Amino acid sequence: MKFSLFFSVFFLAVLHACLSESEIDLEDEEHFMSSDSFLSEIQDESRGKTCIERNKECTNDRHGCCRGKIFKDKCTCVKNGKTEKCVCTQKKWAKIIESYIGDIPALPKPVDDKCVPKHADCSKRKDDCCKGGIFKYQCKCYDMYDDDGEKTDLCGCVSPVEHQAIEGALRIAKKLIGDRWGR
């Protein structure tokens, strides 16, 4: 019980830290990155250095592998007698996650700053669904056939099953933690 309680509190703390960042925080970070600081000088220096592509030799520069879509590739070394050969590779778990997530596109701006509410027709604006709870709703379309056999699309903004499961688990964890501490 202590183990699960510890990890649920830790998960909620990390989730709160991720979700609590506002636009003001982002503006402060942009200002800090543009200022003449030690960190920005280091980043400028590291940008000038070329990275080693995947499946290329990295024996002389083990920390110089390029990034994938999300994660940085790792320099994997193999000893053959007295010689050691190193190659930039992508870890198996990183490959699985990147293939599942795919490219991370920027969220499109809604038309007229109004989003499509939950269960409303989104056939003309598939990328403009509103945000509900933690996640943004997604436009889901179904093929409908009328009495004449003509096919039409029925589209609506809905919450995917995996998002519903995560939000439900967080609600239960909140309730358990609140009941445990008398809140």
Swiss-Prot record:
Domain repeats: 51-77, 115-141
Tissue/organ expression: Expressed by the venom gland.
Motif (Processing quadruplet motif): 44-47
Disulfide bonds: C51-C66, C58-C75, C65-C88, C77-C86, C115-C130, C122-C139, C129-C157, C141-C155
2 X approximate repeats with cysteine pattern C-C-CC-C-C as annotated region, ranges: 51-141
Propeptide span(s): 21-47
Keyword line: Amidation, Cytolysis, Disulfide bond, Knottin, Membrane, Neurotoxin, Repeat, Secreted, Signal, Target cell membrane, Target membrane, Toxin, Transmembrane
Region spans: Predicted alpha-helix: 164-177
Signal peptide per UniProt: 1-20
Compartment list: Secreted; Target cell membrane
Function: Spider venom toxin that exhibits cytolytic activity by forming an alpha-helix across the membrane. Lethal to insect larvae. Causes instant paralysis and death in the larvae of the flesh fly (S.carnaria) at doses of 20 ug/g, at doses of less than 10 ug/g causes reversible paralysis. Has cytolytic activity against insect Sf9 cells. Causes stable and irreversible depolarization of fly muscle fibers, leading to contracture at higher toxin concentrations. Destabilizes membranes.
Domain comment quoted from the record: The presence of 'disulfide through disulfide knots' structurally defines this protein as a knottin. This toxin contains 2 'disulfide through disulfide knots' that are separated by a short linker.
Name of the protein in its database record: DELTA-miturgitoxin-Cp1a
Species of the source: Cheiracanthium punctorium
Organismal lineage: Eukaryota, Metazoa, Ecdysozoa, Arthropoda, Chelicerata
